[in-house]
């Protein structure tokens, strides 16, 4: 089973593009800052993980229309890994959450 549930704040507005072809599909990418449960050190400083999310189709269009930097959201999805070769010829590994459901966490 591959399932993840996250609650966090958008670090910036989603980046949206559309796939090429006859049936173009919206693709939205955004990053969530998800607070860790524990404090980093004795000064009480909160730490967060920054997790990349990608939404497709209607979910992407929803994110484009309603999601903005700083908004607190809940995302349900699955983890997907991948890789690509960058301009310097180095292999780069990626980990993203493919969004299955997303909703507002506060009104």
Report each predicted region and the residues it spans.
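Single-stranded nucleic acid-binding surfaces, predominantly the OB-fold ssDNA-binding core
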Residues: 1-107
